[in-house]
């Protein structure tokens, strides 16, 4: 997608040349500040009842008198903020996408700040993404190729910054969605490793992939215990973005990469098990964040760690009651083989120590309990570090990718006690998302750490089934906030 900024004013929108003109309106319908042809058709439409001034409402007009653009769409935003602006742009694109429009101009009756410009890029990317890798019958790609954001001259510089940031994040979100949407027989650990190696062709990114033998040498007994039930070879993927001095401690992103999760011997119910291809959503978000960072080139060092394998039942698979030894030396009683994400993450969290990180953030589709607690709108955020938690919450707000902080009280650790190992891998149904985070916390004593449980936000079910690409916007904004 070609995103551009054009400095103009709302008093001359009728003269803009484009295949279609999308105008986001909000506030008082009589105070939109549009030039005469557009103000007149808007007023007439409202008076006739063709457009109710309510959030989400749209109106399509073909060749309105006195307007250069062949098509005009009005989209009503609930308020003047970037979230409402994004929703309105998305609604307008829903009308425009089937029309074969190649060049769309987007304007607003109110101010367009950098956050609005970023939101416009996100809305356009979401609207034009379509999965077709394994679906030859999928609809053709939308014709839309170019979006010009119309802003006042005084807004142009900030809008360009936001649009560039939004375009970069959109590339990352698209990569994360594409990886996560691949079926499990296509998206294997080897596939994720290959996608990571593609990123190494971009500036400042290096990639190394550790195989089973290398992981054995490192003592990653917990990760390899999960992997041993599958015929697919495990991969431990290490990405580095070197944007600052070597002496600068990096941000480390750790993404859970279970490319298919049957539950193992503690096998899942058949219903909706197909959605367990999305259990590598954390890994996808790390790859997507690196794609965005490579585009933006911030002055910060970033490391990505992706432990990737399948969780399968077989004669070699781990069993309930087995005890495994993690890379940290701590032993774990595997009470439920379907709580495997934490078993692969704990070794990655120990491996992260070698980078002497500024902060470590792990991202995982970890628990159904988090979905019960928070639904599908906010990711669960766990951290004992108030400053880090606040920074991540701010990043989520800035990227329209919100999270909600959950508790990590020491008392929850009691649930993980085991008579046969240093800890159990589950703590019962009560507070399941919290006890999962408490398990991970046991491997993070040497650095500042946060955990994002994205089980409710990494994908959608039902008619709109598909990966969301979250939390790439949150992670990218967080990395940018660390720039010197």
UniProtKB/Swiss-Prot annotation:
<keyword id="KW-0963">Cytoplasm</keyword>
<feature type="binding site">
    <location>
        <position position="261"/>
    </location>
    <ligand>
        <name>Mn(2+) 1</name>
    </ligand>
</feature>
<feature type="binding site">
    <location>
        <position position="340"/>
    </location>
    <ligand>
        <name>Mn(2+) 1</name>
    </ligand>
</feature>
<keyword id="KW-0378">Hydrolase</keyword>
<keyword id="KW-0464">Manganese</keyword>
<dbReference type="InterPro" id="IPR000819">
    <property type="entry name" value="Peptidase_M17_C"/>
</dbReference>
<dbReference type="InterPro" id="IPR008283">
    <property type="entry name" value="Peptidase_M17_N"/>
</dbReference>
<dbReference type="GO" id="GO:0030145">
    <property type="term" value="F:manganese ion binding"/>
</dbReference>
<feature type="active site">
    <location>
        <position position="268"/>
    </location>
</feature>
<feature type="binding site">
    <location>
        <position position="261"/>
    </location>
    <ligand>
        <name>Mn(2+) 2</name>
    </ligand>
</feature>
<feature type="binding site">
    <location>
        <position position="256"/>
    </location>
    <ligand>
        <name>Mn(2+) 2</name>
    </ligand>
</feature>
<keyword id="KW-0031">Aminopeptidase</keyword>
<dbReference type="Pfam" id="PF02789">
    <property type="entry name" value="Peptidase_M17_N"/>
</dbReference>
<dbReference type="InterPro" id="IPR011356">
    <property type="entry name" value="Leucine_aapep/pepB"/>
</dbReference>
<keyword id="KW-0479">Metal-binding</keyword>
<dbReference type="InterPro" id="IPR023042">
    <property type="entry name" value="Peptidase_M17_leu_NH2_pept"/>
</dbReference>
<feature type="binding site">
    <location>
        <position position="338"/>
    </location>
    <ligand>
        <name>Mn(2+) 1</name>
    </ligand>
</feature>
<dbReference type="GO" id="GO:0006508">
    <property type="term" value="P:proteolysis"/>
</dbReference>
<keyword id="KW-0645">Protease</keyword>
<dbReference type="GO" id="GO:0070006">
    <property type="term" value="F:metalloaminopeptidase activity"/>
</dbReference>
<comment type="function">
    <text>Presumably involved in the processing and regular turnover of intracellular proteins. Catalyzes the removal of unsubstituted N-terminal amino acids from various peptides.</text>
</comment>
<feature type="active site">
    <location>
        <position position="342"/>
    </location>
</feature>
<protein>
    <recommendedName>
        <fullName>Probable cytosol aminopeptidase</fullName>
        <ecNumber>3.4.11.1</ecNumber>
        <ecNumber>3.4.11.10</ecNumber>
    </recommendedName>
</protein>
<dbReference type="GO" id="GO:0005737">
    <property type="term" value="C:cytoplasm"/>
</dbReference>
<dbReference type="InterPro" id="IPR043472">
    <property type="entry name" value="Macro_dom-like"/>
</dbReference>
<feature type="binding site">
    <location>
        <position position="279"/>
    </location>
    <ligand>
        <name>Mn(2+) 2</name>
    </ligand>
</feature>
<feature type="binding site">
    <location>
        <position position="340"/>
    </location>
    <ligand>
        <name>Mn(2+) 2</name>
    </ligand>
</feature>
<dbReference type="Pfam" id="PF00883">
    <property type="entry name" value="Peptidase_M17"/>
</dbReference>
<comment type="similarity">
    <text>Belongs to the peptidase M17 family.</text>
</comment>
């Amino acid at each position: 997608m070609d995103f551009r900024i054009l400095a103009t004013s709302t008093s001359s929108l009728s003269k803009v040349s484009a295949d279609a003109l999308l105008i986001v309106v909000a506030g008082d319908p009589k105070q939109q500040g549009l030039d005469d042809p557009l103000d007149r058709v808007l007023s007439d439409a409202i008076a006739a009842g063709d457009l109710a001034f309510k959030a989400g409402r749209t109106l399509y007009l073909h060749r309105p008198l006195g307007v250069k653009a062949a098509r005009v769409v009005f989209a009503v935003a609930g308020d003047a903020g970037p979230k409402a602006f994004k929703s309105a742009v998305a609604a307008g694109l829903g009308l425009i996408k089937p029309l074969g429009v190649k060049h769309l101009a987007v304007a607003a009756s109110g101010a367009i700040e950098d956050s609005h410009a970023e939101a416009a890029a996100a809305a356009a990317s979401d609207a034009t993404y379509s999965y077709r890798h394994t679906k030859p019958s999928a609809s053709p790609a939308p014709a839309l190729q170019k979006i010009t954001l119309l802003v006042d001259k005084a807004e142009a510089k900030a809008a360009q910054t936001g649009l560039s940031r939004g375009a970069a994040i959109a590339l990352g979100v698209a990569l994360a969605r594409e990886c996560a949407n691949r079926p499990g027989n296509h998206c294997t650990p080897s596939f994720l490793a290959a996608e990571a190696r593609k990123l190494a062709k971009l500036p400042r990114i290096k990639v190394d992939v550790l195989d089973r033998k290398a992981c054995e040498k490192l003592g990653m007994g917990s990760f390899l215990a999960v992997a041993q039930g599958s015929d697919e070879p495990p991969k431990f993927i290490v990405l580095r973005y070197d944007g600052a001095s070597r002496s600068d401690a990096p941000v480390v992103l750790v993404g859970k990469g279970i490319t298919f999760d049957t539950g193992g011997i503690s096998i899942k119910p058949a219903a909706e098990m197909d959605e367990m291809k999305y259990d590598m959503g954390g890994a996808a978000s790390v790859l997507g964040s690196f794609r965005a960072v490579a585009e933006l080139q911030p002055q910060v060092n970033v490391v990505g760690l992706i432990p990737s394998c399948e969780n399968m039942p077989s004669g070699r698979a781990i069993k309930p009651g087995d005890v495994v030894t993690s890379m940290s030396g701590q032993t774990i009683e595997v009470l439920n083989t379907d709580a495997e994400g934490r078993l692969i993450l704990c070794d990655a969290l120990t491996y992260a120590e070698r980078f002497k990180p500024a902060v470590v953030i792990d991202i995982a589709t970890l628990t159904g309990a988090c979905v019960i607690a928070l639904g599908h709108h906010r990711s669960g955020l766990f951290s004992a570090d108030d400053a880090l938690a606040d920074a991540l919450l701010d990043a989520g707000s800035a990227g329209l990718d919100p999270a909600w902080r959950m508790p990590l009280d020491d008392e929850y650790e009691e649930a993980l006690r085991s008579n046969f190992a240093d800890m159990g891998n589950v703590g019962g149904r009560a507070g399941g998302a919290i006890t999962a985070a408490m398990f991970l916390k046991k491997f993070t004593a040497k650095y500042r750490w946060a955990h994002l449980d994205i089980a409710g936000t990494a994908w959608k079910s039902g008619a709109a089934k598909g990966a969301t690409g979250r939390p790439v916007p949150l992670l990218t904004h967080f990395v940018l906030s660390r720039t010197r």
